[in-house]
Amino acid sequence: MNIQALINDKVSQALEAAGAPAGSPAAVRQSAKPQFGDYQANGVMGVAKQLGTNPREFAQKVLDVLDLDGIASKTEIAGPGFINIFLSEEFLAKQAEAALADPRLGVASEEAQTIVADYSAPNVAKEMHVGHLRSTIIGDAVVRTLEFLGHKVIRANHIGDWGTQFGMLIANLERVQQESGEVSMELADLEGFYRESKKLYDEDEEFAVKARGYVVKLQSGDEFCAEMWKKLVDVTMIQNQRNYDRLNVSLSRDDVMGESMYNDMLPKIVADLKAQGLAVEDDGAQVVFLEEFKNKDGEPMGVIVQKRDGGFLYTTTDIACAKYRYEELGADRVLYFIDSRQHQHLMQAWTIVRKAGYVPESVSLEHHAFGMMLGKDGKPFKTRAGGTVRLADLLDEAEVRAAQLIESKNPELAEDEKKAIANTVAMAAVKYADLSKHRTTDYVFDWDNMLAFEGNTAPYMQYAYTRVASVFAKAGVSMDDLQGEIKITDEKEKALIAKLMQFEEAVQSVAREGQPHIMCSYLFELAGQFSSFYEACPILVAEDEAVKQSRLKLAALTAKTIKQGLSLLGIDTLERM
């Protein structure tokens, strides 16, 4: 149950009954400190100002008609007109019982929407590098959360599989194939192959002429070029899939919807934009001038949709892409996990999409932008030699460092178990370090911090889970075989349940805002509440069996919530570390 939403509805009804205009915001939030209750209604002052009345007097009117029977044990007016709400112990215990009995932990399914999520999007014939990490794991965490809430999510891996560079790549692939027979699907060094192709193109005029010819042939559907192009895509995606599998990212080959998918739509779109009077000829190119964006001279900015030579641009593809996602995929929402530097480009494409009537305003187009991954020097994360860090190399190093960590913590474990634990911790550490930061900010990549057992890190959260799970091993009972009712006998129990009952609020916030750090913060706070409870409230040596069973139930609900929350982030838990 979303208790915040429940109370918000109740306060909204009371506001209206007290004379507020219909639809006035109740602005119910989780209280910052326990002395202000569990929730606080902050909307009274704004309404009182609107009505020209004293805020505290109006707050009292609201309280007089506020029905929180069976939910709150106390309400009070604080400061200039805040309403503090204290949840009743009986209500909390009842909600905790219901959550523990529910495989979904009390989280309701939402009314299903069709949501397209555009994330990862690496380029063909290039290896994935650290720059692809944020889009891939942030997008995947949000997708998992949306699916958990019951939405139909279509993953769209918008790979860069088209463009003039394919002429030189096909020409080089042909050369390699002629020299060494069949090209291996391993093609180990994609980056090397790309650099070699570029060098040949720049230095060998005969090769360059052939490459330019292959661009034209590929675009006109030549069978040989199409076959070579497909081989390049296959080789690249086989390598990318290894990274996805290692990272426990839910993308597969079936989710690939590359730039090439929209090729046939582009001439029709430009023709339609011309017919609507949106695209006009300017110096031989087709340009859409947008009043919403100004150039440095304060004039409407021109967005080119077709070059003078007849070629199309990324903007044209993005217009086609949005149109396809609405018309063919039936999207209610489209989420783009693309770095913040692309914001203006996307906004311009979407402005054209709306003006042309391709996607109605009722369909939400959302840019879930993210900042950069920086090194300790505050500059973009690079190798020591100043090169781009390959994603596979980063994951390899994470596994080596995690193995050293596990060896130092638990050397007596069997080798295969140590390796399995190290792999799980390594991938979790890389992902959680990113997911726990607000996605719009740049963040500093720091091995020592991400593998620490203190603070808001993956090892800390995974250890928090194993610590709770160990209670049941010591008790010799299963989490699913507990008797009696949850009874609150201590303030720390009440505080733990109140935090547990905020799980649905965290889940819904991640889904609504595309911000996985909300879940990380919630889980970290929950682990802290459990520690306080564990120290203050003995479980296995509780004063009587009823209290012991009740506290075991709270431990079970905590373990299940941490496990489910981490699962939504694409992170596995461990039974022991």
Curated annotation (Swiss-Prot):
Keywords, ordered alphabetically: Aminoacyl-tRNA synthetase, ATP-binding, Cytoplasm, Ligase, Nucleotide-binding, Protein biosynthesis
One cellular component (GO) term of this entry: cytoplasm
Subunit structure: Monomer.
One Pfam family here: tRNA-synt_1d
Superkingdom as given in the UniProt entry: Bacteria
GO biological-process terms attached to the record: arginyl-tRNA aminoacylation
Family note: Belongs to the class-I aminoacyl-tRNA synthetase family.
NCBIfam families: argS
Reactions catalysed according to its record: tRNA(Arg) + L-arginine + ATP = L-arginyl-tRNA(Arg) + AMP + diphosphate
Known EC number: 6.1.1.19
Biological classification of the source: Bacteria, Pseudomonadati, Pseudomonadota, Gammaproteobacteria, Vibrionales
Protein's name according to its UniProt entry: Arginine--tRNA ligase
Localization annotation: Cytoplasm
Motif 'HIGH' region: positions: 122-132
Organism encoding this protein: Vibrio vulnificus (strain CMCP6)
Keyword hit for ATP-binding: yes
Example GO molecular function: ATP binding
SMART domains tied to this protein: Arg_tRNA_synt_N, DALR_1
PANTHER family reported in the protein's UniProt record: ARGININE--TRNA LIGASE, CYTOPLASMIC, ARGINYL-TRNA SYNTHETASE
